[in-house]
Amino acid sequence: MKKYDVIAFDLDGTLTDPEHGLVEGFIYAFKKMGVTDYGDRDSLRRFIGPSLYKVWQDEFGFTPETVVEAIEKFREYYNIYGWWDNKVYPGIREMLAELKKAGKTIVLATSKPEDTALKIMSLFELDQYFDFLGGAKGDNRDHKWQVLEYSLDAVGADRKSAVLIGDRMYDAEGAAKCGVDCIGVTWGHGSQKELEDAGATCIADTPEDVLKMLI
């Protein structure tokens, strides 16, 4: 496999499992907005990963103004209770430590709001392994590809020597838009088929698999 000097990571579903806190936040927001046909808890997992603005407009027919209100309701819950209702996947710390030891430049590129992402990285002490932490911020840095560009530019990354590691099709699609390879991981919220259909360069089933590909 080609050598990568800069390793970009997604957060939700890749480094940490945020499912319980996020799903509780989704349910809170939908109830506040009067939405009753949002499905069961398992079906709400599909909202983990992408930018909620476009997804909720497409799924529920929210107007741009209404989706902003819905996301504000979601954040009422999530910013107090949901963000720390989270856990690091097994093997992640060891993987990051080995990548750092190998001299890789490591950055975060998440569609989660940057201030929340920074709190999560600090809470779990994952920030110590990273050279730069990038997240969504405003209309000009909302989509995955925009955040990835931001994080890669921050460390002066050559796109040919960079790779994004993520668990959803949005990661593979965002990486492709930036001209960057993508390692799709199956321990998160996307399937191998979803990742392959979206154009992931290769698939890893465990953090140990990622290490074997990168070192």
Stretches found by the model and what they are:
Residues 2-93:
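N-terminal helical cap/lid subdomain that shapes the substrate entry/recognition surface
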Residues 1-2, 101-104, 154-159:
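Glycine-rich phosphate-binding loop signature in dinucleotide/nucleotide-binding domains
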